[in-house]
Amino acid sequence: MGPGDLQDVLSGLKQQEHADLLVGLGRSDDAAVYRITDDVAIVSTVDFFPPIVDDPYLYGAIAAANSMSDVYAMGGQVLFALNVAGFPRDMPKDVIAAVFKGGADKVLEAGGVIAGGHTVVDAEPKYGLAVTGKVHPKRIFIKGGLRPGHRLFLSKPLGTGVVATAAKDDACEPAVLEGAVQSMLRLNRAAAEVARDAAVRGATDITGFGLLGHAAEMVDASGAGIALRLGDIPILPGALALAEKGTFSGGMKRNRTHLEHTLGARGRLSLGPSVGAAHAGLLFESETSGGLLFGVAPEDTRMVHDGFKRRGEACWEIGEVTAEIGIAIR
């Protein structure tokens, strides 16, 4: 569901107040957080979607990584997960088993366990997880935690959306698809660990609303602005070439329309002259199992770079937080 439609649907729902519900509907963050003790809070989230690759094992693993990402986006650690699935009646059992195996292996990699689940009959396959994690109540990452002067980091390249769209039409080179698959399989666990070490408070993960859509959520929640450097934003190999051919999903169009009617209508969305149609599309395009976007104080940037390097992971410093509300791409 696009961001505008989701806002309309949720507009009539009110936050149910509770002293221990630290993050709920009222904050519209990546996951719910409920305090258990002064030192432990539970992080809860759910996500599922139809297949984006042909291999059932990889589909299960990617869906699981995507589902667990919201726990990492809140600064949490994965504890356990429940399968959430729908499959056609005639789908071979070995295919379904492979989907579940892919999900279970990815949860195990995250340090968690599959504890159960629920399945229904559905015309189109769907799979994901309801994930439970934990976080210290005073160390929660939130979308509203950015402050002017913070440096912005992204932990994965953009481009999974255009690659997956091309793959559906058999219009994607195998090496390009493999690069996207490996990116989607990579957990945001290391990124969350580095961010915790750097005392991050403002973070989100880049998924269905795209980089600019999720950045806009942080702008609204933080009451600050975001300035991004186009040349520093990482893009998967082959993704820009696909974007130049106009290979975009319906999600990109919905995301762009929503932002142009919200931030854009208030003069708070600025795409500089260097941002061509292909790059703009990638910035608005939906991502699957995308990276963490987070802000750190300037004095902590070296800690972030060193932390990713020690873990053998890549990261990119792509911009900064400004006092002027809005998003600008230079």
List each language-model region with its residue ranges.
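Glycine-/charge-enriched secondary-structure boundary and capping motifs
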Residues: R89-V113, V120-Y127, D197, T207-R330
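Active-site glycine-rich loop that binds ribose-phosphate moieties when present
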Residues: A130-I140, P174-R196, V275-G276
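Small-aliphatic-rich amphipathic alpha-helix that forms the alpha element of a beta-alpha
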Residues: P56-A81, K101-E109, R186-G202, I206-E217, ...
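Glycine-rich anion-binding loops of enzyme active sites
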Residues: I36-V53, Q77-C172, L211, E320
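Extreme N-terminal cap/leader segments of soluble proteins
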Residues: M1-D54, L58, M74, N83-G86, ...
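Acidic-glycine-rich active-site phosphate/pyrophosphate-binding loop
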Residues: A32-V43, L185-A191, L259-P273
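Short, compositionally biased
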Residues: A164-A180, R311-A314
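A generic local secondary-structure boundary/capping motif
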Residues: D20-V23, A31-Y34, S69-Y72, A104, ...
